[in-house]
């Protein structure tokens, strides 16, 4: 199976060789647009975005140095038009877990995309890691912004006065820093 650290290794290899990292983002909603903004700012990245909303795509193209493709995120034809066969990474960030997972499956099966990341919000999927793998649903890394925010809030409640809590070595040590504004 693939390791979760694979995307980092791939990115590091590309940056060392001074090549462009070709990234395909699926979904131009809040999460997808934010990811596109941050990734497109780096010169080493070439970003393409797929979405079904032409207005959102036009707006992104006006604001960012990205290529846009109109269509359904999991459609083989749309992925082909976006150049999925030449992508180093697919990041599926639509609002649908199922579309994100199917898009990763299509990218893997038809285009042999090396790294596939999917936004998966439902704990029903996330709580079953055995669903994911090269011979299963080929998602190298599942991300859930909602769960990250929830975890962060839970830690802040557990450690009042800290604005950030960091875990080290599987929660054996916790570091929190308290910041008070000066009047």
What do these predicted regions represent?
Residues 4-6:
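Intrinsic disorder/low-complexity segments enriched in small, polar and charged residues
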Residues 10-181:
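Cytosolic regulatory regions of ion transport systems
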């Amino acid at each position: 199976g693939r390791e979760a650290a694979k995307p980092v290794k791939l990115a590091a290899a590309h940056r060392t060789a001074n090549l462009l990292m070709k990234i395909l983002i699926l979904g131009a909603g809040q999460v997808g647009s934010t990811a596109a903004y941050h990734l497109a700012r780096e010169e080493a990245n070439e970003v393409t975005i797929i979405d079904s909303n032409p207005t959102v795509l036009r707006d992104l193209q006006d604001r960012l140095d990205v290529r846009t493709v109109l269509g359904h995120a999991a459609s083989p034809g749309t992925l082909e038009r976006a150049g999925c066969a030449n992508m180093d990474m697919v990041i599926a960030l639509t609002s649908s877990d199922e579309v994100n997972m199917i898009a990763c499956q299509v990218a893997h099966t038809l285009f042999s995309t090396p790294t596939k990341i999917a936004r998966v919000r439902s704990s029903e999927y996330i709580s079953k890691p055995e669903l994911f793998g090269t011979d299963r649903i080929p998602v190298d890394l599942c991300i859930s912004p909602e769960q990250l925010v929830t975890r962060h809030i839970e830690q802040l409640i557990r450690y009042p006065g800290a604005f950030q809590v960091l875990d080290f070595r599987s929660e054996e040590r916790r570091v929190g820093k308290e910041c008070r504004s000066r009047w």
